[in-house]
């Protein structure tokens, strides 16, 4: 029994070590860095495009400006637990070829090891790989790389996504706790705009 427990412990350690030590956990793609303030990248994003992420209203997402080598991109950041901190980087490369994808996949494998999960379809119309990491601070980070040239329901071409999972979850939890506060629920209601009935001069000036 003791030997079995020891074996399970060793295997669990090796599995965890494999996640952590296959390569240093990535935090950056292009100029964008996870857990940094979105304000640090104001020259690379269009803040006026900020909208809540679908099904995650607490997370906001902005479009990137034109950056060499990239076609499009969206940077998501927290608004509750760590306001402004980047939680996800989604970029689409300008080069949509499979050759580019294979070369990038090869480089990622060389640096971070084999992917942990295949997320594409069995026919390889959509090819998608996922890596999972835990960095030195205990942050859980996922990296997704995909190639798609036929599935219209997915982003066409070559796309990459880097997400700090725990930061997303912490922000969602923060948002839920605030929403549970009766006062916060009242603030979030779509209240009718009231008219004071005062003239502009009387309204703005102290009397």
Please place each PLM-identified region on the residue numbering:
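General secondary-structure edge motif
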Residues: 9, 21, 87-89
């Amino acid at each position: 029994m003791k030997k079995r427990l020891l074996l399970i412990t060793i295997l669990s350690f090796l599995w965890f070590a494999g996640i952590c030590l296959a390569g240093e956990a990535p935090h950056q793609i292009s100029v964008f860095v996870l857990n940094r303030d979105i304000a640090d990248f104001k020259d690379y994003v269009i803040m006026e495009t900020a909208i809540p992420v679908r099904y995650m209203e607490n997370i906001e997402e902005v479009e990137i400006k034109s950056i060499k080598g990239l076609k499009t991109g969206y940077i998501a950041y927290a608004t509750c637990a760590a306001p402004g901190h980047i939680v996800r980087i989604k970029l689409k490369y300008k080069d949509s070829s499979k050759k580019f994808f294979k070369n990038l996949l090869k480089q990622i494998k060389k640096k971070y090891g084999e992917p942990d999960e295949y997320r594409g379809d069995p026919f390889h119309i959509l090819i998608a790989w996922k890596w999972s990491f835990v960095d030195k601070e205990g942050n859980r980070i996922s990296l997704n790389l995909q190639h798609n040239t036929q599935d219209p329901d997915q982003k066409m071409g070559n796309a990459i996504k880097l997400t700090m999972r725990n930061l997303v979850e912490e922000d969602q939890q923060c948002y839920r706790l605030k929403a549970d506060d009766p006062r916060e629920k009242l603030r979030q209601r779509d209240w009718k705009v009231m008219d004071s009935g005062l003239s502009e001069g009387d309204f703005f000036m102290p009397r």
